[in-house]
Curated annotation (Swiss-Prot):
Quaternary data: Homodimer. Interacts with TJP1/ZO1 and SPEF1.
Keywords carried by this UniProt record: Acetylation, Cell junction, Coiled coil, Phosphoprotein, Tight junction
N6-acetyllysine carried by residues: K576
Species of the source: Canis lupus familiaris (Dog)
Main localization category: other
UniProt-annotated stretches for the region Head: 7-354
Protein name according to UniProt: Cingulin
Region described as Tail: 1155-1196
UniProt lineage: Eukaryota, Metazoa, Chordata, Craniata, Vertebrata
Annotated signal peptide: none
GO MF terms held by the record: microtubule binding
Coiled-coil ranges from the UniProt annotation: 355-1150
One GO CC term on file: myosin complex
Region listing for Interaction with TJP1/ZO1, in residue ranges: 54-67
Domain of life: Eukaryota
Length: 1196
């Protein structure tokens, strides 16, 4: 198409304040032909015709008023437009309809002026006060540069220069009717400047005062296209209202779906208003009722010839009026807008390509700006998270150092316990040596008893004692066998522990190497990740949540470890106290041993004295030789005992060496652990350095946080492993303590056996002394009878006192037994309470398992639903992509079919390409939304995995609780066994008391026998005295004297025997007193042990309660996580609904574009190439354009 005029300058903004159109009467067909061929109309006919004035004024909310006035006799119609800036007044400053002039239009016919090059939403005309020459073209007006937004720019009539007549100028006299109309419109605003501030009064320079070119002298299309290529800006409406209002520069640079058609400022303003104005405005009947004049377009339809602009307007008006309830003004506005939009269809493909390139560049600039803003927002958050992680790493390093100190302390305590074990083993060896010596002495006494076979009561007593000694020896041998078996078991356990320790050390070394490799790999990944791109924000949030949960768990674990360390410290203090008590007991035993050795030395000295006396007074040498032989045998036995003692010492040293080796192995393992801790500290330092480097690199902040999380997880794993190793050391220390306790028990049993053997030895020694004294009894004198009598009386008194003491001690023992029974009942009650607590714990564990199973099922169902939704979305997206591709293929085929046509088909294909790009952009947004959904799903899956991990942790905790319960049961069994041992000891004590009673009865019977012997001796003494008195008077033979001497010797022997029995009774009384003291000490120790066990059980019960509370808190936390997951699922459903709505809108838009393109292509195929203008303004293409959803009327 040919253009009306050319412009030297670039086009400026068009004012929508006032538009004036001169309407003339129609002319004949000949004149139309001349006009179409570019000819001029005669001046006479132009002056003879009448004309009307159509004035458009901006009204309420951008809706125009149409006022028609009759004109004067003059020239034909000229299109005139008064231009100004596009500043709109506020929507509230509106005027009523009465202030506008009424329509006085009386003509029903007008000539349709042909305006191919018009760029406004109405035809433009020019009014001249004087004689105007007709050029069949409208003057293309140009507004000045924009001024300040507070004042509107005035209008200026500026005509394009005419090449044919360079000397002619244009009269720019003001228009009175237009000025009066403008003044009346501006006077209604009440002092507020609305629309234009006044008419432009700028005078044109002489080089611009030229007439417009006629149709014969128009520029060719090439120059017009070049001028249109010089348009600097192309506007694209934004989809958001606030973005357009906030940033006009970005909106001016973008290009929307109508950017390919925008060739004038008025079209741009219409598109802007279509995106800004609400949809309800067009349907408000109160807003659409405007005052209008008779229908001009209907009159034009009656007279306009086919193919002209008025004919096109009439067809558009008829199409829009059919079946619509809108007012005439809105329909006319739409008609003008449709004409405006159809003009850019003639644009060349080069300009469209430039527009598309600019739109793509603007989109890229916006995307880059958004990315920069997001990175700037993310940077402070990442820096704060990095600082928090560094603090946490420092805290973990401090905790590692504390754990190392605890390990060193516990190693020292283990060494002390091993030393004490060695001491206990030495004591046990010494007791075994003493036992062997006593056995040798017993054998000697047995040999002597076999040699002496005289049937005397003393020998019978000796036989009984020997039988008892044999029983005791058998018991001691059985205990020895048990001890040996126990020691063998311990040695086997030690060997097994050695193998297990070696395996654990090897596995630990492998794990350390694996951790080192992982650390190196992680360091390399860190260095690589510093150079990589940033990750998504959703993944960051998920990682932060994980880090927060991990920090909370670590804090809980730290609290638990602190509590456990306090508990273990208290246990160690108790063990230290017990070790101190055992040391004191050992010192007491040593003192008693020294006392016993002193007593033995005194007895040996007494024996030596008696032997000397026996040597002096013995008549035979045979007895002396026998005594010498016995002494030699005793010396040999002493040597054998010394050799056995040396052998036992060698065995003890060997055991000590083995224990030292075990301690060295454990120390080496502790050193390995320390080295591992040092390596962990080094890795932590490396992590800190990496963190500092990552803080310098702002771009890789998110990747750094992720890698730090992994590193921290590895450190936490290593810390947990160290804690487990510490627990293993604690268990080993407990095992050593148990071994100590068992050794103490064995030592106590050995001491008891030693005491019994000592008693038996003392008895046998006393009997030996009595036999030796019996040999020398014949040599003692009668004078010792009185002293023996007195001594017997004193001894009887002492025996009575000892019996009273024994009765008191028996009462005390009965009371102690009653107290022990009460303690046993209390233990039974505590046992029942513990069983009830165990039952409650089992119930809570079952409940926790059920709740965990329910949570797992819920999470699985939610995951399945999300997966199904994802699959649905994927299928929908695939279908949409396939539909879009099919439509694109159809459009491409249509474009290929119509490629041989005219240039308008190229424009259409370009527009279709732009629509395809827009649809591809929509698809990209849909894909982005799908990716966001996928990332959300990944986050939910990660949360589900976290829940599973928490469930596994709960299961582990439950297993730990079950193990603790089993330990408590084992400890209860141990308590039962200790109670049974106590009962056995009590029964033994009772048996010993019974034995003491029987011994007392024997002593009483012996005392009675002695009293009887005393009485008989007194009688015999009296008889002897009487006989002496009678023998003084006469001499008796020597036979009677010899008899008397023999009787005297017998009496002396009896007295010596009685003295010996007294000494034996005193020794037995002393032994009984010592035994009672030992029993009382044992009972006190057992009471303390029972109390300590009660305290331990109470502490464990408290710990179990605390663990139950923690389990309940964990359950509450899991419920909170489940609720959070449900909320996120609901949010995901909402997002899905929004996406579905968006997809529906995209489908509608694509369907509309496809139908429009199909209609336009069908209409273009039926058109001829000769009638470009008619084909462009065809009613079918107009109808396809009017079907767009975003088509709305713009203000003037």
């Amino acid at each position: 198409m040919e253009q009306a005029s050319t412009m030297a300058e670039p086009r400026g903004p068009v004012d929508h304040g006032v538009q004036i159109r001169f309407i003339t009467e129609p002319v004949g067909n000949a004149e139309m032909d001349t006009l179409r061929r570019g000819g001029r109309r005669p001046a006479k006919d132009a002056r003879a015709n009448t004309y009307g004035v159509a004035v458009r004024v901006q009204g309420i909310a951008g809706q125009p008023f149409v006022v028609l006035n009759s004109g004067e006799q003059g020239s034909d119609s000229f299109g005139v437009q008064i231009k100004g800036t596009n500043n709109r007044g506020p929507p509230g400053a509106l005027s009523s309809d009465s202030e506008l002039p009424e329509s006085t239009y009386s003509h029903a016919k007008e000539f349709p002026a042909r305006s191919q090059g018009s760029m406004s939403d109405e035809e433009l005309g020019a009014h001249w006060n004087g004689r105007l020459l007709r050029s069949q073209s409208q003057a293309s007006l140009k507004g000045p540069a924009p001024v300040s937004p507070s004042t509107r720019s005035t209008s200026l009539l500026q005509l394009a220069p005419e090449v044919a007549s360079p000397g002619s100028t244009i009269d720019t006299a003001p228009l009175s009717s237009v000025d009066s109309l403008i003044n009346k419109f501006d006077s209604r605003q009440g002092g507020q400047a609305r629309g234009r501030t006044g008419r432009r009064m700028r005078t044109l320079p002489p080089e611009q005062r030229k007439r417009s070119q006629s149709l014969d002298n128009r520029l060719p299309r090439d120059t017009l296209d070049e001028r249109e290529h010089q348009f600097p800006t192309h506007w694209t409406p934004s989809t958001k209202r606030d973005s357009h209002m906030g940033n006009s520069k970005q909106s001016s640079q973008n290009q929307g779906p109508l950017g390919g058609f925008s060739c004038s400022r008025q079209t741009q303003d219409w598109v802007l208003q279509s995106f800004e104005e609400p949809r309800g405005r067009a349907w408000d009947p109160g807003m659409l009722q405007f005052k209008s004049t008779p229908d001009l377009l209907r009159d034009q339809q009656e007279t306009a010839p086919p193919g002209s602009v008025d004919h096109v307007k009439a067809t558009i008006y008829s199409i829009l009026r059919e079946g619509s309830s809108e007012t005439e003004t809105s329909v006319r506005r739409k008609v003008n807008l449709v004409l405006e939009q159809m003009q850019p269809l003639v644009m060349t493909s080069g300009s469209a390509k430039g527009l598309t390139g600019q739109s793509e560049l603007s989109q890229k600039v916006e995307e880059l700006q958004q990315k920069l803003d997001e990175e700037v927002k993310k940077r402070p958050k990442l820096e704060s998270s990095r600082l928090g992680l560094e603090r946490q790493l420092q805290e973990k390093a401090e905790e590692c150092s504390q754990l190392q100190e605890l390990l060193e302390r516990r190693k020292g305590e283990a060494q002390q316990s091993t030393k004490e074990l060695q001491n206990m083993k030495l004591l046990v060896d010494q007791s075994e040596r003493v036992r062997c010596g006593l056995e040798a002495q017993v054998k000697e006494l047995q040999d002597k008893l076999k040699q002496a076979q005289e049937p005397e009561p003393a020998k019978e007593a000796l036989m009984k004692d020997l039988l008892e000694a044999r029983e005791l020896l058998e018991e001691v041998l059985e205990g020895k066998q048990r001890m040996e078996e126990h020691l063998r078991l311990r040695e086997r356990e030690l060997t097994a522990l050695k193998g297990a320790l070696k395996e654990e050390v090897a596995s630990r070394d492998q794990e350390v190497e694996h951790v080192r490799q992982q650390c190196q790999r992680d360091a390399e990944q860190l260095r690589r990740s510093i150079q990589d791109a940033t990750q998504d924000h959703a993944a960051l949030e998920v990682e932060r949540q994980k880090m927060s949960t991990l920090v909370r768990e670590l804090q809980k674990e730290l609290e638990e470890t602190s509590e456990e360390t306090g508990h273990w410290q208290s246990m160690f203090q108790k063990n230290k106290d017990e070790l101190r008590a055992t040391k004191q007991e050992l010192l007491q035993l040593r003192m008693e041993k020294e006392e016993i050795e002193e007593e033995l030395g005194e007895k040996i000295e007494v024996l030596q004295r008696e032997l000397g006396q026996a040597r002096a007074g013995a008549a035979d040498t045979r007895q002396m030789e026998e005594l010498k032989k016995e002494l030699c045998q005793t010396q040999k036995e002493l040597k054998e005992l010394k050799e056995e003692q040396q052998n036992q010492e060698v065995a003890g040293r060997h055991r000590e060496r083995e224990l030292e080796k075990q301690l060295k192995v454990e120390a080496d393992r502790g050193q390995g652990l320390e080295q591992q801790n040092l390596q962990l500290q080094k890795t932590l330092q490396q992590l800190r350095q990496d963190c500092e480097e990552a803080s310098k690199a702002q771009v890789a902040a998110e990747a750094e946080v992720a890698v730090l999380g992994q590193r921290r997880a590895a450190v936490e794993v290593t810390l947990r492993e160290t804690q487990e190793e510490n627990d293993e050391f604690r268990r080993r220390i407990l095992g050593l303590e148990q071994q100590l306790k068992e050794a103490r028990g064995l030592a106590e049993g050995g001491e008891v056996a030693e005491a019994r053997l000592r008693d038996k030895v003392q008895r046998l020694e006393a009997e030996k002394q009595r036999l030796e004294e019996a040999l020398n009894a014949a040599q003692e004198e009668e004078g010792s009878l009185a002293a023996a009598k007195r001594a017997l009386e004193a001894r009887l008194e002492e025996a009575q006192r000892g019996l009273a003491r024994l009765g008191q001690e028996q009462l005390a023992l009965n009371r102690a037994l009653e107290e022990e029974g009460k303690q046993r009942e209390a233990l039974r009650r505590s046992k029942a309470e513990l069983e009830e607590q165990k039952r409650l714990l089992d119930k809570t564990v079952c409940q926790l398992n059920k709740e965990l199973e329910q949570i797992g099922n819920d999470s699985k169902q939610a995951l399945q639903q999300l997966q199904a939704q994802l699959e649905d979305y994927k299928e929908k997206a695939r279908r949409e992509v396939a539909d879009a591709q099919r439509q694109a293929k159809e459009w491409a085929t249509e474009a290929e079919k119509n490629s041989g046509g005219l240039s308008r088909l190229q424009d259409e294909t370009q527009r279709l390409r732009q629509a395809l790009q827009a649809s591809q952009a929509d698809r990209d947004t849909a894909r982005l939304d799908k990716e966001l959904l996928a990332q959300r799903l990944q986050g939910l899956e990660q949360e589900a995995e976290n829940k599973k991990r928490s469930q596994d942790d709960r299961a582990r905790q439950l297993k730990g609780l079950e193990e603790k319960v089993s330990r408590l049961e084992a400890e209860l069994d141990e308590e039962r066994s200790t109670v049974e041992l106590l009962t056995e000891r009590v029964t033994r004590g009772r048996d010993q008391v019974d034995q003491l009673r029987s011994e007392l009865m024997q002593e009483r019977s012996a005392r009675q026998d002695l009293e009887c012997d005393k009485i008989s001796l007194e009688r015999q003494n009296k008889d002897l005295k009487s006989r002496l008195a009678s023998s003084e008077g006469f001499q008796k033979p020597s036979a009677s004297l010899s008899q008397l001497e023999s009787q005297n010797q017998e009496l002396q022997e009896r007295l010596q025997a009685e003295e010996r029995e007294k000494t034996v009774l005193q020794s037995t009384n002393r032994k009984l007193e010592r035994r009672v003291k030992e029993l009382s000490i044992q009972i006190d120790d057992e009471r303390q042990h029972v109390n300590d066990q009660k305290d331990q059980l109470s502490l464990r019960v408290k710990a179990l309660k605390r663990q139950v509370d923690e389990a309940e808190e964990e359950i509450e936390r899991l419920d909170g996580l489940r609720k959070k997951a449900q909320r996120e699922l609901e949010e995901q459903h909402e997002v899905n609904e929004q996406l579905q709505a968006r997809i529906k809108t995209l489908e509608k838009d694509s369907w509309r574009k496809a139908s429009r393109s199909a209609a336009e292509s069908a209409q273009r195929e039926g058109l001829s190439s000769d009638e470009e203008f008619d084909s462009v303004y065809d009613p079918s293409s107009i109808a396809s354009l009017l079907t767009e959803s975003n088509l709305q009327t713009s203000s003037c």
